[in-house]
């Protein structure tokens, strides 16, 4: 049996199966949420799924230890791309200048690349300097991620800035950082970031979203409109939902903003059409995917593989929690997409790249002859 065949057969097939199932569900969900509009988003989403699968397979088969020499250059390149969004090349959508226009391809969101390459860089640093004093670990980790975090916050993309928090906490904790340092880091970080966010990082519409989250009745026809309509839509889905592509739904009638129903509010469309059952099936599938990722982390051959796997898993978990949470008023609206489900090529490919790395950690958990 050749090494290639052995790698293919030795993949984490629970991870592969759940990721593929979510990708297919994503195309169906995007179709059902946008088919009554002129834009054929599901066609583009299907193309990105194919591209993501190719990236996943290639990344899975290559030994993940290539990040030892490529992580930092890729991270620096992603920071440069984020900086380019501040130039004429940057493109604004929904009040945030987060995208670059690539001729013939479409838009590209560099912050998505910055997070995943940041995970690789921090993982490499922590694995190489495990015995470094905890305070120095915090300082150097802050130096690594501080620049891109501020750049992303200034765009402003509050959601992508928040993603760094669970990612860094999980990686530092597994690297052996004492809990007292983590608690101090959280307190100091919140003490510094909170006033900066209010004064410089958040635009008026983002502040109104937070107010609407605290009190949905404060502006029911304005900033709280979307979340209130999302709750109505999901609630009206009941136990079994109104049915696939059902007529007369909140989504079809345009009560959910047409620019976000296939992205930020994709779970709303799923909840209305497929009800409580559909929501539970989707969340359960994500749970299986995340457990498969954690099992790969448990079987990692070295600390680099462990840290990469846990960091990417934390990123995916936070996206799932935040996206679904904001549609049912458990979290404020931030615009974070639902992994593999929401429309968007950059994020889908980056998630598949991350899952490919996790699968590579599993495949190469033992030295192959």
Model-derived features: where do they sit?
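Re-entrant/interfacial helical elements at transmembrane boundaries that shape
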Residues: 164, 245-253, 285, 327-335, ...
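N-terminal membrane topogenic signal
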Residues: 1-20
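Hydrophobic alpha-helical transmembrane segments of multi-pass inner membrane proteins, especially
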Residues: 16-228, 268-328, 353-357
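A juxtamembrane structural motif centered on a specific transmembrane helix
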Residues: 1-2, 30, 319-369
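Helix-boundary and loop/linker segments of multi-pass membrane transporters
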Residues: 7-9, 138, 254-257, 300-301
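Extracytosolic (periplasmic/ER-lumenal) interhelical loops and adjacent juxtamembrane/interface segments
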Residues: 226-245
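Glycine/serine-rich anion-binding loops at beta->alpha junctions
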Residues: 104-114, 154-156, 238, 242-243, ...
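Long extracytoplasmic/lumenal interhelical loops at the membrane interface
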Residues: 239-274
């Amino acid at each position: 049996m050749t090494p290639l065949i052995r790698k293919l057969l030795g993949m984490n097939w629970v991870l592969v199966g759940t990721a593929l199932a979510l990708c297919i569900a994503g195309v169906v969900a995007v179709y059902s949420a946008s088919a009554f509009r002129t834009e054929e988003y599901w066609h583009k989403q299907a193309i990105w799924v194919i591209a993501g699968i190719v990236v996943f397979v290639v990344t899975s088969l290559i030994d993940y230890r290539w990040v030892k020499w490529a992580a930092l250059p890729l991270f620096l390149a992603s920071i440069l791309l984020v900086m380019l969004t501040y130039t004429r090349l940057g493109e604004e959508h929904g009040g945030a200048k987060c995208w670059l226009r690539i001729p013939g391809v479409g838009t590209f969101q560099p912050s998505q690349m910055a997070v995943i390459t940041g995970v690789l860089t921090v993982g490499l640093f922590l694995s190489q300097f495990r015995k470094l004093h905890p305070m120095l670990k915090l300082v150097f980790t802050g130096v690594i991620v501080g620049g891109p975090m501020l750049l992303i916050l200034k765009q402003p993309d509050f959601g992508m800035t928040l993603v760094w928090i669970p990612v860094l906490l999980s990686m530092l904790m597994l690297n052996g950082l004492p809990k007292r340092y983590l608690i101090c880091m959280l307190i100091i970080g919140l003490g510094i970031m909170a006033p900066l966010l209010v004064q410089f990082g958040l635009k008026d519409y983002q502040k109104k979203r937070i107010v609407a989250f605290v009190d949905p009745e404060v502006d029911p026809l304005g900033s709280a409109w979307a979340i209130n309509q999302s709750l109505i839509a999901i609630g009206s889905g009941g136990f079994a939902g109104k049915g696939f592509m059902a007529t007369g739904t909140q989504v079809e009638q345009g009560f959910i903003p047409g620019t976000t129903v296939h992205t930020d509010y994709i779970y709303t469309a799923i909840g209305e059409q497929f009800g409580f059952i559909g929501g539970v099936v989707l969340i359960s599938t994500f749970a299986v995917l995340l457990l498969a990722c954690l099992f790969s982390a448990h079987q990692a051959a070295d600390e680099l593989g462990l840290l990469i796997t846990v960091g990417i898993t934390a990123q995916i978990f936070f996206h799932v929690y935040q996206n679904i949470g904001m549609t049912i008023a458990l979290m404020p609206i931030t615009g974070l997409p639902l992994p593999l489900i929401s429309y968007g090529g950059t994020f889908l490919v980056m998630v598949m790249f991350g899952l490919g790395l996790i699968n590579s950690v599993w495949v190469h958990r033992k030295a192959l002859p």
